[in-house]
């Protein structure tokens, strides 16, 4: 016997969270809980403002329609990426496809303070990997901060994310301030320039490896082994169903590229599922999931070790 519940939620964010030039005051989303007999599965649907094609309201309409279809015995998935991902996660839990084992390590997001980063990395087992957002300030400043971190911590590898912020000139200004001897310890720089061709040229000219992120969601993108391209960053909430995520990971691995499962600022429930997906599909690769500290609360399932309060399902608004 099938049954389902849908919950709507809103989590206050820390004051300093800015996405694409807009401040994110709250993180809004939905949960779906599917039941079939004794089995249960949860999924999170939380379109990311400025990045997702669909709004929260559109996702809610699509989710409620899909849930009603599922209750009638239909097995298809919605088209909207965030809804397809959340629904497929709930189904994967329900059927036991999604393993319980999780990779709760996360590459810490660094603000540029090497002392703070040394402390955060001290307890990290294995490789010392951190992530730095670049492109928010002057390119020269970014280059100096990255150089300082790599100089201060000799076994550090950095993942950098520019979100296509730079012109070719700005990208070169950044590289100029990173010691060529340290550049090999930049694991990758996500989408440095506004166009893929400019990003490819940057990688060739500087020896700094790049990764594709936004490109994966463009219609003309194809997976290829290219000089200077080392990784792809996969954000499941923006990608679509779990099957589509698996296909992208497999395509990357077949070409020798690193595939990194990355957060779209999901709630703790969604993040714990991403940690399980990372352990399952990209074992041995540190996922990019260090976003919970941007929020003021957890929900339903807590992240191990987090001191944030965790709301129970009874405290959420139920729609179905």
UniProtKB/Swiss-Prot annotation:
Task: Tell me which domain of life the UniProt entry assigns to the organism this sequence originates from.
Answer: Bacteria
List the catalytic activities from the record: (1R,6R)-6-hydroxy-2-succinyl-cyclohexa-2,4-diene-1-carboxylate = 2-succinylbenzoate + H2O
Q: Name one GO molecular function term.
A: magnesium ion binding
The EC category is: lyase
Instruction: Copy the pathway line from the protein's UniProt record.
Output: Quinol/quinone metabolism; 1,4-dihydroxy-2-naphthoate biosynthesis; 1,4-dihydroxy-2-naphthoate from chorismate: step 4/7; Quinol/quinone metabolism; menaquinone biosynthesis
Q: Where is the active site?
A: 133, 235
**Alphabetically ordered keywords of this record:** Lyase, Magnesium, Menaquinone biosynthesis, Metal-binding
Q: Which residues bind Mg(2+)?
A: 161, 190, 213
Task: Please list which residues make up the signal peptide.
Answer: none
Alphabetical list of Gene3D superfamilies matching this protein: Enolase-like C-terminal domain (3.20.20.120), Enolase-like, N-terminal domain (3.30.390.10)
Is Metal-binding there in the keyword field? yes
Cofactor(s) named in the record: a divalent metal cation
- Share an example GO biological-process annotation for this protein: menaquinone biosynthetic process
Q: What is its EC number?
A: 4.2.1.113
Q: Which InterPro entries match?
A: Enolase-like_C_sf, Enolase-like_N, Enolase_C-like, Mandelate_racemase_C, OSB_synthase_MenC1, OSBS_N
The record's PANTHER family line, in alphabetical order, gives: O-SUCCINYLBENZOATE SYNTHASE, O-SUCCINYLBENZOATE SYNTHASE-RELATED
The family annotation for this protein states: Belongs to the mandelate racemase/muconate lactonizing enzyme family. MenC type 1 subfamily.
Q: What is the role of the protein in this entry?
A: Converts 2-succinyl-6-hydroxy-2,4-cyclohexadiene-1-carboxylate (SHCHC) to 2-succinylbenzoate (OSB).
Instruction: Give the protein's recorded name.
Output: o-succinylbenzoate synthase
Q: Which gene encodes it?
A: menC
């Amino acid at each position: 016997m099938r049954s389902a519940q849908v919950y709507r939620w809103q989590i206050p964010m820390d004051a300093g969270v800015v996405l694409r030039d807009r401040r994110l005051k709250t993180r809004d989303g939905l949960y779906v809980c599917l039941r079939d007999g004794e089995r249960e599965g949860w999924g999170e649907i939380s379109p990311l403002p400025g990045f997702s094609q669909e709004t929260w309201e559109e996702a809610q309409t699509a989710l409620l329609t899909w849930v009603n279809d599922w209750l009638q015995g239909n097995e298809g998935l919605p088209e909207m990426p965030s809804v397809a991902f959340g629904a497929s996660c709930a189904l994967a839990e329900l059927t036991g496809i999604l393993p319980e084992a999780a990779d709760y390590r996360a590459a810490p997001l660094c603000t540029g303070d090497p002392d703070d980063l040394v402390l955060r990395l001290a307890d990290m087992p294995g490789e010392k990997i951190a992530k730095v957002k670049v492109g928010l300030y002057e390119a020269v400043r970014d280059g100096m901060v990255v150089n300082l971190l790599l100089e201060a911590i000799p076994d550090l590898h950095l993942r950098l994310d520019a979100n296509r912020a730079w012109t070719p000139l700005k990208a070169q200004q950044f590289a100029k301030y990173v010691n060529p001897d340290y550049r090999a310890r930049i694991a990758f720089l996500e989408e440095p320039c506004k166009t893929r061709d400019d990003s490819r040229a940057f990688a060739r000219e500087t020896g700094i490896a790049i990764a594709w992120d936004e490109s994966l969601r463009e219609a003309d993108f194809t997976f290829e082994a290219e000089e200077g391209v080392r990784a792809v960053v996969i954000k499941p909430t923006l990608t679509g169903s779990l099957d589509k995520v698996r296909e992208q990971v497999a395509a990357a691995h077949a070409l020798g590229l690193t595939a990194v499962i990355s957060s779209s600022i999901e709630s703790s429930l969604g993040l714990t599922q991403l940690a399980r997906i990372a352990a399952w599909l990209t074992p041995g690769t540190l996922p990019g999931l260090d976003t919970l500290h941007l929020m003021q609360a957890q929900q339903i399932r807590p992240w191990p070790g987090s001191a944030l309060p965790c709301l129970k399902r009874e405290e959420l608004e139920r729609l179905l």
